[in-house]
């Protein structure tokens, strides 16, 4: 849905022009995968600071396809959300305009394009976790490789292939084990993981409820959801600090090439990735900043951090479409799918 944020017109745009900076357009259009609540918070703060009115359209999994389909006649200025692999792909297709935010040099190389075509905004670790009322720390898996052991048959549940984090997780595991043991071994791993999985859920809340009710002991999910269910919903969950690391998805942002409001787009990227912009989202929505400087005022759990799994996202970007098709078509057992009522 198209949502407008803010209608505050003030004189700040004129001030920036007088100060020798580029004058901003009056409005901005954003395509995003983020929640409406989060987008509203960010856009209101941006409007407050710049006077630029923002409209956002929440597109979830269709984001990349929409940007791609409008390449000859862009309707939006900003693509906000989605993983590194997706941004690498669209950059190659010529969908983005490079920008140079003031914080770019502070951002680690893993979280940005070398030529400024896209930037990482939030780190989203995917972790394994278990119900500690059903399993002791000794019995629980220690690493991703343990999930395929015979002892865990029927004790694992996860999201289905509609979940973007699950898709990134499967692609990451195929890439990681291909690099480590060869591609045949990687597919053997994913096949055994499917065999050990009791159910796939099309809803995150249903999956967590199933773990809470003891239908299975082990699952995997983005870290902030696990923490939310542990702390706010009082579920008996224990997070596993995997030996190989957490599959860390980087949520990105980019300015769309030939967009109607390029100056406002560059200013929005400047705002979102800044220390203040990152802290706002960290404290309001538990999203871990990609910019290290923002961590000092972020929630405490973000500062301990989880070691990221060593992954080459350019390899994942090149192969993700084929890998996920193979997983969905040849491996995923559709009879294990559970849909929300």
Regions flagged by a language model, labelled:
Residues 18-89:
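Early extracytoplasmic/lumenal segment of secretory-pathway proteins
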Residues 85-89, 212, 217-236, 285:
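A ligand-binding cleft/hinge motif common to bilobed small-molecule-binding domains
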Residues 246, 251, 256-311:
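Mature extracytoplasmic/periplasmic domains
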Residues 29-40, 74-215:
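Extracytoplasmic ligand-binding site segments that recognize negatively charged/polar headgroups
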């Amino acid at each position: 849905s198209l949502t407008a944020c803010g209608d505050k017109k003030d004189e700040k745009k004129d001030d920036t022009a007088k100060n020798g900076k580029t004058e901003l357009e009056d409005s901005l259009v954003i395509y995003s995968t983020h929640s409406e609540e989060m987008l509203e918070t960010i856009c209101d703060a941006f409007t407050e600071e710049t006077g630029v009115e923002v409209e956002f359209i929440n597109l979830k999994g269709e984001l990349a396809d929409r940007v791609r389909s409008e390449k000859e006649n862009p309707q939006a200025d900003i693509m906000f959300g989605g993983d590194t692999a997706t941004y690498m792909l669209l950059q190659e297709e010529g969908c983005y305009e490079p920008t140079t935010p003031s914080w770019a040099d502070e951002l680690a190389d893993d979280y940005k394009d070398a030529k400024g075509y896209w930037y990482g905004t939030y780190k989203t670790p995917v972790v394994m976790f278990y119900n500690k009322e059903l399993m002791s720390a000794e019995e629980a898996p220690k690493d991703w490789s343990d999930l395929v052991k015979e002892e865990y048959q029927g004790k694992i549940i996860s999201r289905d292939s509609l979940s973007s984090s699950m898709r990134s997780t499967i692609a990451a595991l195929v890439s990681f084990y291909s690099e480590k043991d060869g591609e045949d071994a990687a597919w053997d791993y994913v096949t055994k993981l499917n065999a050990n999985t009791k159910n796939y859920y099309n809803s995150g809340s249903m999956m967590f409820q199933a773990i809470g009710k003891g239908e299975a002991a082990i699952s995997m999910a983005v870290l902030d959801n696990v923490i939310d269910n542990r702390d706010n919903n009082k579920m008996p969950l224990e997070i596993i600090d995997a030996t190989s690391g957490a599959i860390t998805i980087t949520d990105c942002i980019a300015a769309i090439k030939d967009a109607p409001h390029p100056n406002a787009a560059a200013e929005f990227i400047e705002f979102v990735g800044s220390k203040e912009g990152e802290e706002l989202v960290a404290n309001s929505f538990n999203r871990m900043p990609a910019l290290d400087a923002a961590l000092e005022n972020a929630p405490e759990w973000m500062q301990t951090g989880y070691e990221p799994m060593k992954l080459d996202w350019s390899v994942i970007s090149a192969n993700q479409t084929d890998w996920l098709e193979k997983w969905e078509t040849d491996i995923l057992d559709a009879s294990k799918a559970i849909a929300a009522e």
